[in-house]
C-alpha cells in the first residue's frame, strides 16, 4: 500500500456518471460482503452524500462517490484519485496516526482486490478506526467531555495554525471580497431552502463592509492560512495522543484557506449552539493564550454568524423542518452580539493568590476574554505560555525593561479587545499604582463606554 495513489489513470470522464456510480457502488458492496465473510465482526457501511465508508474491526476505508455537485466534482477516477491524495495530505497535518494511506482497488467490480493486476477501479483513503464515543459531539451528549480536553484541543489547533502554510496577497484566499462572497453565497443558499434569514443577510452585508479593512490587514499580516475548514464538534476526536481534528475539507481549497480565527470559530459556535457557552469561552481562552491572536476578535462575531449559517444550511438541506437548523439559526442571531457590551475587569492580588483560577471561572460565567500578564510576558520573550519561569524579580524576563514592555503589550491588547466590543478580564497583579491608574481607566471608560470593575 502506498502513501499516495498510483499515477492517475486515463480520464474516464467520458463514461456516463450513472455508469461510474453503479460500478463503484457495486465494488463497495462486494468488498463489504467479502470482508464480512472473511471474519467477524461484520463490516459496516456508512453513506454520506459524497462518500461510502467501510468499517472493519480496526480500519476504515473511505471511497469518493462518482458525483458532480455544485461544490465538488468527483466525476472521473482521476478526480477521485486526486481527492483521496488531498484528503490524506490535509488531514495528516492534524491526525497523522489516523490517516494511514491511499489504497487502489484492482480486478473487477464483482471481484475487487487491493493487490492485483489490471487497471485501477477505485481509490480509498485508509484510516485507523476509532470508537464513536471518542468524538466530541458524542462525548458532550454523554456528559463525558472534559474541560481539559476542550482546552487541549484549542491549544492543538493554535499550534496547527501557527505551523500552517500562509496565503499570499497574490492568491484569492482571504481577500475582503472573497470573504464577503463566501458568506453571501452561504446565506443565499440558506435562503433558497426557505429559511427565514433576511435579517442575517442584511447584517452580514453591513458587517462585511465594516470589516473589509480588518480582513485586508489579516491577509497582509499572515493570518490567512491553509486551515481545516470544518471544525465542528463531529469532526473533533480524543485519540491516544490527545484531542485533535479529522475530516478537513479536501474538495474546495477556498473553504480551508481562510483566516485562522474563522477556522477556530466553528469550534466555538458549535458549543454555543448546543447550550455550552462555558466550554466555548474556555476554548477561546486557551486558544488566545496559545496564539496571542487577540486581533482576530475584531471579526469573530462575523465568523461565528457565518459558521452557524453553514450548519443551519446543511441541516435544512437534510431536513427542511429540522429542529437542528432552527437551533443554528437562533445561534447565528445570538452571535451578532455575543461577548458584549464591552466591559473591563481587573484582577488584583499577589502572584499565587488564585487570581488566574478565579478569572478562568469568571470568564466562562460572564462570557469574557482574558489576557494574562505572565503569558504575554513570556510571549514577548519567546517562552511557551505553559512553561515554568524561575527567575527572580529584576532578572531574566522580570527586569524593569521587560515589565515595561509587558505593560505596553497589555495596554495594546486592552484597547484592541474593548474596541472590538468584547468583555475583557485583565489577569495581572495590579499592585503598583501605575498599573491600575484611575486616570487611564477613566479614559478607557469614556472612549469605549465600558463597565469597569476590580
Predicted regions and their residues:
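Single conserved hydrophobic/aromatic residue that forms the stacking wall/gate
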Residues: 54, 440-454
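The conserved Walker
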Residues: 350-351
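Conserved lysine of the Walker
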Residues: 355
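Hydrophobic positions on the alpha1 helix immediately C-terminal to the Walker A/P-loop
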Residues: 358
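Conserved substrate/cofactor phosphate-moiety recognition/catalytic segment
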Residues: 363-422
Amino acid at each position: 500500500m502506498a502513501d499516495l495513489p498510483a499515477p492517475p489513470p486515463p480520464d474516464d470522464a467520458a463514461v456516463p456518471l450513472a455508469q461510474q456510480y453503479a460500478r463503484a457502488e457495486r465494488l463497495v458492496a462486494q468488498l463489504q460482503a467479502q470482508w464480512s465473510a472473511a471474519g467477524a465482526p461484520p463490516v459496516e457501511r456508512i453513506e454520506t452524500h459524497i462518500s461510502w465508508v467501510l468499517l472493519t474491526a480496526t480500519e476504515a476505508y473511505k471511497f469518493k462517490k462518482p458525483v458532480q455537485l455544485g461544490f465538488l466534482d468527483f466525476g472521473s477516477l482521476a478526480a477521485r484519485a486526486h481527492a483521496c491524495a488531498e484528503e490524506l495530505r490535509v488531514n495528516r497535518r492534524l491526525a497523522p496516526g489516523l490517516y494511514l494511506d491511499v489504497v487502489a482497488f484492482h480486478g473487477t467490480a464483482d471481484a475487487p482486490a487491493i493487490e492485483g493486476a489490471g487497471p485501477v477501479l477505485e481509490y480509498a483513503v485508509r484510516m485507523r478506526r476509532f470508537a464513536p464515543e471518542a468524538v466530541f459531539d458524542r462525548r458532550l451528549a454523554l456528559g463525558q467531555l472534559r474541560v481539559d480536553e476542550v482546552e487541549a484541543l484549542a491549544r492543538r489547533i493554535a499550534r496547527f495554525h501557527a505551523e500552517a502554510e500562509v496565503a499570499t496577497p497574490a492568491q484569492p484566499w482571504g481577500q475582503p471580497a472573497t470573504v464577503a462572497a463566501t458568506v453571501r453565497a452561504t446565506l443565499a443558499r440558506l435562503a433558497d431552502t426557505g429559511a427565514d434569514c433576511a435579517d442575517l443577510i442584511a447584517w452580514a452585508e453591513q458587517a462585511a463592509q465594516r470589516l473589509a479593512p480588518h480582513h485586508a490587514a489579516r491577509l497582509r499580516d499572515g493570518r490567512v492560512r491553509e486551515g481545516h475548514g470544518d471544525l465542528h464538534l463531529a469532526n473533533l476526536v480524543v485519540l491516544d495522543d490527545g484531542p485533535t481534528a479529522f475530516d478537513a475539507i479536501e474538495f474546495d481549497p477556498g473553504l480551508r484557506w481562510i483566516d485562522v480565527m474563522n477556522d477556530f470559530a466553528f469550534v466555538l459556535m458549535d458549543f454555543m449552539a448546543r447550550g455550552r457557552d462555558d466550554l466555548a469561552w474556555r476554548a477561546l481562552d486557551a486558544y488566545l493564550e496559545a496564539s496571542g491572536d487577540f486581533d482576530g476578535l475584531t471579526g469573530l462575531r462575523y465568523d461565528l454568524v457565518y459558521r452557524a449559517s453553514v450548519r443551519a444550511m446543511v441541516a435544512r438541506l437534510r431536513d427542511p423542518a429540522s429542529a437542528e437548523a432552527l437551533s443554528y439559526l437562533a445561534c447565528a442571531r445570538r452571535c451578532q452580539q455575543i461577548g458584549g457590551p464591552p466591559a473591563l475587569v481587573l484582577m488584583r492580588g499577589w502572584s499565587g493568590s488564585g487570581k488566574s483560577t478565579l478569572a478562568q471561572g469568571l470568564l466562562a460565567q460572564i462570557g469574557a476574554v482574558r489576557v494574562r500578564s505572565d503569558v504575554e510576558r513570556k510571549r514577548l520573550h519567546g517562552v511557551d505560555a505553559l512553561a515554568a519561569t524561575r527567575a527572580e524579580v529584576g532578572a531574566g524576563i522580570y527586569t524593569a525593561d521587560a515589565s515595561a514592555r509587558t505593560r505596553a503589550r497589555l495596554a495594546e491588547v486592552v484597547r484592541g479587545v474593548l474596541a472590538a466590543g468584547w468583555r475583557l478580564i485583565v489577569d495581572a497583579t495590579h499592585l503598583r499604582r501605575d498599573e491600575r491608574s484611575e486616570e487611564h481607566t477613566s479614559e478607557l471608560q469614556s472612549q469605549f463606554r465600558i463597565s469597569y470593575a476590580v
